[in-house]
């Protein structure tokens, strides 16, 4: 079940040459449940884009590599898509675009895997996963039981979720379900950089594929390919301030952009 002294260099986007003294690549929920029943203190590794390995890992490393994307429901306007945790995020977005499903195009080229996307409510260019998130299934490490989490259960905020706070380290996310548009797509080109790129591409009436292409072009102009130069993608948080503080700034700078954070209400 576990291999010994496995290099983690190809499994983290910085390309750090750390070693796992005990390593298991998990491709099924059944195997995961068996491991969790025997080991509680695990190092969970997914897409490897939000970690910086500084030394070899002594505790057992569990590399979650479950695959699968399926359409679980549809109606006239929407489609519900479930993706397993080990699916590469950008490849999942591309799969949705190939099917002409809208809602995730602004999140193109973000490194990492589907399973970790809800943990910090990943977002870019005016869109967060909570906007199309329906639910996820996760395994409780202490009991091995599988629980379904709704959007409300996840307590999404600005780069926040319950899995970074109250339930940190207690669950392993197994799959995520999204509700996407099947037609009548809602285009989000609110960011100036996207509008400028669309203008440069001579796109007057952009569709979801145009938005994705613009985002990819912008991201590639800012960040190197992690396969060539190790990096963790665009990694930052905008400042979170009080409403009264923002009011003062807005009085001085009327056009200052802002975003109301549901996780901060003071």
Model-derived regions, located:
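Conserved small/polar residues in nucleotide/adenosyl-binding loops
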Residues: 265-266
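Short coil/turn segments at secondary-structure boundaries
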Residues: 227-231
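Long, low-complexity interaction regions most often at the N-terminus
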Residues: 251-255
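Active-site-proximal loop/hinge segments that shape catalytic or ion-binding/gating pockets
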Residues: 236
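Anion-binding (especially nucleotide phosphate/pyrophosphate-binding) glycine-rich loop
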Residues: 2-136, 140-142
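Short, conserved charged micro-motifs
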Residues: 31-33, 186-187, 244-248
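FAD-binding subdomain of flavoenzyme oxidoreductases
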Residues: 117-218, 224
């Amino acid at each position: 079940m576990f291999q010994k002294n496995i290099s983690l260099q190809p499994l983290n986007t910085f390309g750090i040459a750390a070693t796992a003294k005990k390593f298991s690549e998990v491709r099924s929920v059944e195997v995961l449940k068996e491991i969790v029943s025997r080991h509680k203190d695990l190092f969970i590794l997914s897409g490897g884009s939000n970690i910086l390995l500084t030394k070899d890992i002594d505790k057992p490393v569990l590399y979650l590599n479950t695959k699968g994307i399926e359409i679980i429901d549809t109606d006239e306007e929407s489609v519900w898509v479930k993706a397993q945790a080990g699916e590469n995020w950008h490849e999942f977005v591309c799969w949705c675009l190939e099917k002409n499903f809208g809602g995730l195009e602004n999140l193109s080229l973000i490194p990492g895997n589907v399973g970790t996307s809800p943990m910090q409510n990943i977002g870019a260019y005016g869109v967060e996963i909570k906007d199309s998130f329906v639910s996820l299934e996760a395994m409780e490490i202490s009991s091995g039981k599988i629980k379904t989490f709704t959007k409300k259960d996840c307590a999404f905020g600005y780069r926040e979720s319950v899995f970074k706070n109250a339930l940190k380290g207690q669950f392993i996310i197994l799959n995520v379900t999204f509700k996407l548009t099947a037609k009548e797509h809602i285009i989000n080109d609110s960011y100036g950089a996207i509008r400028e790129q669309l203008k440069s591409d001579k796109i007057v009436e952009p569709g979801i594929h145009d938005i994705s292409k613009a985002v990819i072009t912008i991201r590639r102009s800012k960040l190197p390919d992690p396969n060539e130069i190790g990096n963790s993608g665009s990694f930052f948080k905008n400042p979170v301030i009080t409403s009264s503080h923002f009011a003062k700034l807005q009085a001085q700078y009327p056009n200052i952009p802002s975003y109301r954070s549901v996780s901060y209400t003071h």
